[in-house]
Amino acid sequence: MTDAYSYHQRILDELARHGLKPRPSSSPQQLRDAVRDLYKYEIKRLRDAYLAGAFPKRDFAGQVIELRKRYPLLSIPTELWTR
């Protein structure tokens, strides 16, 4: 039998910001992995933009911080995602 997960509304809202709408059978770890993959994609794009000269080095750290703020789920343990 597959586990059914009941997510806190705050977690569902954050997942929706990233285009994710979990099913009851979607495990927190699967969802965290998907969010992490999105973050990794965006951080690589940011790095590539920096290397292409889109912005100066002094702005890179600030942009990384702003990107990280869009992914608060990565700092919340998955054990706290469900009721």
Each predicted region: which residue ranges?
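Non-transmembrane amphipathic alpha-helical segments
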Residues: 39-47, 67
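Short, charged, amphipathic alpha-helical segments
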Residues: 57-66
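Long, non-catalytic architectural segments outside compact domain cores
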Residues: 1-35, 78-83
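Amphipathic alpha-helical coiled-coil segments
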Residues: 69-81
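Charged, low-complexity interaction regions
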Residues: 25, 52-57
